[in-house]
């Protein structure tokens, strides 16, 4: 085992258990999908649940459902009456993801939809107190602006994969479109006066964003 794997194992032994259902979902994701590591996993999943419990949102928007692991974790933290709206643009994931979401103990709190969140989320006609962004890295900035337009003042955005395996600092990836998208997003929000930002070196980079201002200054 690598040093990172040893530390991860230690952490998992000292936090809330993942639970049998999520364990089986994570395993199935790695067996039956091409990019299984994209699932949040035990450590980040427990953090997502805790953050929801701390923020106590009424509505959460998730951009990028993938296998449903993070959606279930987010929904686990929701208070009574809370709702998670989650969008997956890849319709080929639906046959895998929908049964796992519908079979979970929090299925009644999750509204799972296939479609482009940047187009479909504004059509819901509702606002959100929290959002988890984990979709197409090439359009992260566009997604951020869409989400911010639906976010209530004082709300929070969590953006995943913001360090992108370290590619954000590696010039070898200067021409990679996904790396470019992440860099563009990171550079923009670091200077956006509407928000406060922290980048956490958790897994592939997790960025909590606090929405503090209504509009850009003129």
Model segments located where?
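C-terminal substrate-binding/active-site "lid" region of AdoMet-derived donor-dependent transferases
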Residues: 141-211
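SAM cofactor-binding core of SAM-dependent methyltransferases
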Residues: 42-103, 108-118
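Class I SAM-dependent methyltransferase Rossmann-like catalytic core
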Residues: 32-40
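Receiver (REC) domain switch-region micro-motif
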Residues: 60, 131-134
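N-terminal auxiliary segments of SAM/dcSAM-dependent transferases
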Residues: 1-18
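Conserved small/polar residues in nucleotide/adenosyl-binding loops
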Residues: 212-218
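A short acidic, Gly/Pro-enriched loop at the edge of an enzyme's catalytic core
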Residues: 123-130
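Short strand-turn motif at the edge of the Rossmann-like AdoMet-binding core
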Residues: 89, 136-137, 160-163
């Amino acid at each position: 085992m690598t040093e990172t794997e040893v530390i991860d194992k230690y952490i998992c032994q000292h936090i809330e258990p993942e639970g049998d259902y999520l364990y089986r979902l994570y395993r199935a994701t790695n067996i039956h999908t091409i990019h299984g590591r994209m699932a949040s996993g035990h450590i980040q999943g427990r953090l997502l649940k805790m953050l929801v419990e701390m923020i106590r949102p009424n509505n959460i928007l998730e951009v990028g459902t993938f296998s449903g692991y993070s959606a279930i974790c987010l929904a686990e933290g929701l208070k009574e009456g809370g709702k998670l709206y989650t969008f997956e643009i890849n319709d080929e994931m639906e046959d895998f993801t929908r049964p796992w979401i519908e079979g979970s103990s929090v299925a009644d709190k999750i509204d799972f939809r296939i479609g482009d969140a940047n187009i479909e989320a504004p059509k819901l006609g509702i606002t959100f107190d929290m959002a988890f962004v984990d979709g197409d890295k090439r359009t992260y900035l566009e997604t951020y602006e869409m989400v911010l337009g639906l976010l209530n003042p004082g709300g929070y955005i969590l953006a995943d994969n913001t360090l992108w395996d370290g590619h954000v600092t590696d010039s070898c990836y200067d021409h990679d479109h996904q790396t470019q998208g992440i860099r563009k997003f990171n550079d923009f929000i670091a200077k956006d006066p509407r928000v406060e930002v922290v980048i956490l070196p958790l897994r592939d980079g997790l960025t909590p964003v606090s929405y503090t201002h209504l509009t850009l200054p003129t």
